[in-house]
């Protein structure tokens, strides 16, 4: 009977023992989040309001239409090794998806 009390007492100590995380995260309170407009200015991208005002004036520049994402995205995709590129979808697979599965 004494052995079971000792076993349960040691279990309690194991449960109460504080958990120490193995991963250390940086203290985020010291690093304030940057403002979106500041980030865009530092990246050299046009801000949202300036691009809207240019677009609404009727000046449809081909640059605006071509660059929907970051300017270097297309170049990054071209430099990726084949194993990381998106696989092409065959015509048979497209038809299968379009009809919603097997017939």
Curated annotation (Swiss-Prot):
Where does the record place Low complexity bias? Answer: 47-61
This protein's major location comes to mitochondrion
Q: Where in the cell is it found?
A: Mitochondrion
Q: Which keywords does the record carry? A: Acetylation, Mitochondrion, Phosphoprotein, Tricarboxylic acid cycle
Q: GO terms for molecular function, please?
A: protein-macromolecule adaptor activity
The modified positions for N6-succinyllysine read 5
Superkingdom in the source lineage: Eukaryota
Residues with PTM N-acetylmethionine: 1
Which segments carry the region annotation Disordered? 23-70
- Which Gene Ontology CC terms are recorded? mitochondrial inner membrane; mitochondrion; oxoglutarate dehydrogenase complex
Modified sites of kind Phosphoserine: 61, 90
Q: Name one GO biological process term.
A: tricarboxylic acid cycle
Outline what the protein does: Molecular adapter that is necessary to form a stable 2-oxoglutarate dehydrogenase enzyme complex (OGDHC). Enables the specific recruitment of E3 subunit to E2 subunit in the 2-oxoglutarate dehydrogenase complex (OGDHC).
According to the record's subunit comment, the protein's assembly and interactions are: Component of the 2-oxoglutarate dehydrogenase complex (OGDHC), composed of OGDH (2-oxoglutarate dehydrogenase; also called E1 subunit), DLST (dihydrolipoamide succinyltransferase; also called E2 subunit) and DLD (dihydrolipoamide dehydrogenase; also called E3 subunit), and the assembly factor KGD4. Within OGDHC complex, interacts (via N-terminus) with E3 subunit and (via C-terminus) with E2 subunit.
Q: Which family does it belong to?
A: Belongs to the alpha-ketoglutarate dehydrogenase component 4 family.
UniProt-listed PANTHER family = 28S RIBOSOMAL PROTEIN S36, MITOCHONDRIAL (PTHR31601), ALPHA-KETOGLUTARATE DEHYDROGENASE COMPONENT 4 (PTHR31601:SF2)
Which protein is depicted?
Alpha-ketoglutarate dehydrogenase component 4
Gene encoding it? Answer: KGD4
């Amino acid at each position: 009977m004494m052995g079971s009390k000792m076993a349960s007492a040691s279990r309690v100590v194991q449960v109460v023992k504080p958990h120490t995380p193995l991963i250390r995260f940086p203290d985020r309170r010291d690093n304030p989040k940057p403002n979106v407009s500041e980030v865009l200015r530092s990246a050299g991208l046009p801000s949202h309001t300036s691009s809207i005002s240019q677009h609404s004036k009727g000046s449809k520049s081909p640059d605006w239409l071509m660059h929907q994402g970051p300017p270097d995205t297309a170049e990054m995709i071209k430099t990726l090794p084949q194993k990381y590129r998106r696989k092409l979808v065959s015509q048979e697979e497209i038809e299968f998806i379009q009809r919603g599965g097997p017939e």
